C-alpha cells in the first residue's frame, strides 16, 4: 500500500482554509504506511478461535484469563502460572513453542522411520536414533544413508562446523528480517516458503495453524518419551513398542518404574 497524504487542491479553495476538514476529522490525523497486509481473522464459526472456542476442560473449564482471547492458534484458555500475561513474554514464548513444535515433528519422524526401515530389512547402518550419531567415532565413520560413496562423515568437528554455518545462516536470515516474498508473520513466512500456497485461503490457513500446534505439542511429549525410553530400556521406540505389544504385562511404564524401587 503506497504512502498517501490527503490534500485539497481545488482552484476555488486556493488560499482559503478548508473549514470543513476539522469538523469531519476532529483533531485526528490520517497516516498510511507501507506494510504487509495483516492476515484475515479466522471465521467466526471456527471452534478453535474466539470467545466461544474449545477450552482445555471443555464445559468444565472455568473462565479463561482476560488476556487469552482466542486470537492465536492453540489457545485453550489455560494459563495457571500467568506466563502469557505480559504481551512481550507471550510473544517470545509463542515463537519458541512454534519453533520447538516444528523441530519435534521433524525429529520425531527421524527417530522412528530409520529404525522402522532397519527392522524391515533396509540396510543403511544403525537405525536406533540415539546410537546412530556415535557411528562417526567408529573406524569407518558415519555414512548417509549407509553408503560410503554418498555422504561419508569421519570428523565430528567437521559436522559441528557445518551445523553452525548452515543453521547460523538460516537463523541470521530469520532474525535480520530477510525475506523471499512478502512476510505477514515471522512465524509463517509465506511467499517463497509456501510453494504449495497453503496460506492462500485464510480460513484453511487458520485451521492448519491449529493442527500444527496440536501435533507439535504431541510431538514434544513424544520426544520426551523417546528420551526416557532410551535411558531406561536402552532401546529405540519401535523396539519398545514391539516388546510392549508382545508382552504388555512385563513391558510397560509401571514395570520399569518398579525396577528403580530401593531395595528391590
UniProtKB/Swiss-Prot annotation:
> Binding positions for chlorophyll a 2?
100
Give the cofactor binding note: Binds at least 14 chlorophylls (8 Chl-a and 6 Chl-b) and carotenoids such as lutein and neoxanthin.
Q: Per UniProt, where does chlorophyll a 3 bind?
A: 135, 212
In which compartments does the protein localize?
Answer: Plastid, Chloroplast thylakoid membrane
Residues recorded as binding chlorophyll a 5, renumbered to this chain, are: 211, 229
Tell me which Pfam families the record gives.
Chloroa_b-bind (PF00504)
Question: Phosphothreonine (modified residue): where?
Answer: 35
Which residues of this UniProt protein bind chlorophyll b 5?
Answer: 163, 260
Topology class, membrane: Multi-pass membrane protein
> Where on this chain does chlorophyll a 6 bind?
244, 253
Share the domain note from the entry.
The N-terminus of the protein extends into the stroma where it is involved with adhesion of granal membranes and post-translational modifications; both are believed to mediate the distribution of excitation energy between photosystems I and II.
Its job = The light-harvesting complex (LHC) functions as a light receptor, it captures and delivers excitation energy to photosystems with which it is closely associated.
User: Subunit comment for this entry?
Assistant: The LHC complex consists of chlorophyll a-b binding proteins.
Q: What is this protein called?
A: Chlorophyll a-b binding protein 48, chloroplastic
Q: Which organism is it from?
A: Zea mays
- Provide the gene name from the record: CAB48
